[in-house]
From Swiss-Prot:
GO biological process: positive regulation of blood coagulation; proteolysis
Domain Peptidase S1: 1-227
Protein name as catalogued: Thrombin-like enzyme kangshuanmei
Cellular component aspect of the GO annotation: extracellular region; secretory granule
Alphabetized PANTHER family for the sequence: KALLIKREIN-1, KALLIKREIN-RELATED
Biological source species: Gloydius brevicauda (Korean slamosa snake)
Disulfide pairings: 7-141, 28-44, 78-234, 120-188, 152-167, 178-203
Length: 236
């Protein structure tokens, strides 16, 4: 996160870190949505990966930190009216459930769609500078604004006219999610509304908000898979 501050140690109990299990490199963020499931971005997927839960500083292990491997992964395969930008979402089932603890607790799915103009919270261990690849050892948090989708269409003319993505950032620049913040949450008015997906190659540029997969528009799919329906019908 660019332009943020170190997150309060108690404000990100649902934030998880995805790692490559062979190189041990940090890949992405993710969000614990119940004891057994993590929601992240599809572009974070790697064949070999593990998940750290209850982590703050990458180099310090809390007593209650837990590690899990993916048992199952689900991707949004719908084709009707969905573009590739609408599909940057992945559900990971953990190989065993995690227990709530001082540094681990899930974040519930949204009960309402987000409203344009909301102030939203982003967090992650990603780049703190751009284009230099300075990663953070601790998660950084920042507040950004939720814009009408047309703002992102003006910034990225290749975007389709309608999309199940959210557009959020700081129009003046200087505050943004960046590389390796991918997969982490966008929290608007206390609700988990977006997944960090894509932005400009140079992060935190003026008038270039980032794109976030809209969690609310994928709720039926998420809830069906968690309920055990593996052949989920696509939304209309």
């Amino acid at each position: 996160v660019i332009g943020g501050d170190e997150c309060n140690i108690n404000e990100h109990r649902f934030l998880v870190a995805l790692y490559h299990s062979r190189s041990r490199t940090f890949l992405c963020g993710g969000t614990l949505i119940n004891q057994e499931w993590v929601l992240t971005a599809a572009h974070c997927d790697r064949f070999f990966m593990y998940i750290r839960l209850g982590m703050h500083n990458k180099n310090v292990n809390f007593d209650d930190e837990q590690r899990r491997s993916p048992k199952e992964k689900y991707f949004f395969r719908c084709s009707n009216n969905f573009t590739k930008w609408d599909k940057d979402i992945m559900l990971i089932r953990l190989d065993s459930p995690v227990n709530n603890s001082a540094h681990i607790a899930p974040l519930s799915l949204p009960s309402n769609p987000p409203s344009v103009g909301s102030v939203c919270r982003v967090m992650g261990w990603g780049q703190t500078t751009s284009p230099q690849e300075d990663l953070s050892d601790v998660p950084r948090c920042a507040n950004i604004n939720l814009f009408n989708f047309t703002v992102c269409r003006a910034a990225y003319p290749w975007l389709p006219a309608t999309s199940r993505v959210l557009c959020a950032g700081d129009m003046e620049g200087g505050i943004d999610t960046c590389n390796r913040d991918s997969g982490g949450p966008l929290i608007c008015n206390g609700q988990f509304q977006g997944i960090v997906s894509k932005g400009q190659n140079l992060c935190a540029q003026p008038r270039k908000p980032a794109l976030y997969t809209k969690v609310f528009d994928h709720l039926d799919w998420i809830q069906s898979i968690i309920a055990g329906n593996k052949t989920v019908t696509c939304p209309p």
